C-alpha cells in the first residue's frame, strides 16, 4: 500500500474514532448527577414550565419490571427543540435530554429504568418557553437495585 494512502486512511479512521467524544463534551455532568429533579432542572435553566396537554406520554400505568419501562413521547407544541425526561423518584432523576433541529418531529421512543413507582415528567422547550406533562407509572419490581 502506498505510504501516503496509508496515512490518509489512518487520519480518516482517527477522525471517525474521535467523533463520539465531541458528543460527550455536550453532556451536562452536573445536571445528570443531580440528586433531585429540582436541582437538575435548575442546572439546565428550566424554571417554571407551564402545564401542557400538547405533550403526549404513552407508557404503561403499571410496569411489572422497573428495569425496562417502555415510553413514547411526542410534543405537538410548534417549534419544540428540546425534550427532557425526568423520573422524580430515581436516584438520579434526570433520565434523558433530546435536542431536535427546527422542523424535526419531536418524538422519542425509549426504555427507561425506574427504581420505584414515580411520576415521569417530560419538559418540552419551544423558543424561550418551557412546557411540562407527567404521568405516574406504578412499578412492582424496581429496576434501580430495588
Residue ranges and their predicted role:
Residues 1-19:
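N-terminal secretory signal peptides and thylakoid transit peptides that target proteins
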Residues 127-133:
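Short acidic/polar inter-strand loop motif in beta-rich domains
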Residues 115-119:
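Extracellular Ig-like/FN3 beta-sandwich strand-entry sites
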Residues 26-62, 96-98:
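Transition segment at domain starts
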Residues 136-142:
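Short beta-strand edge segments in extracellular beta-sheet folds
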Residues 70-76:
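Short edge beta-strand/loop segments characteristic of extracellular beta-sandwich folds
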Residues 89-114:
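An anionic, turn-rich surface loop/hairpin at beta-sheet edges
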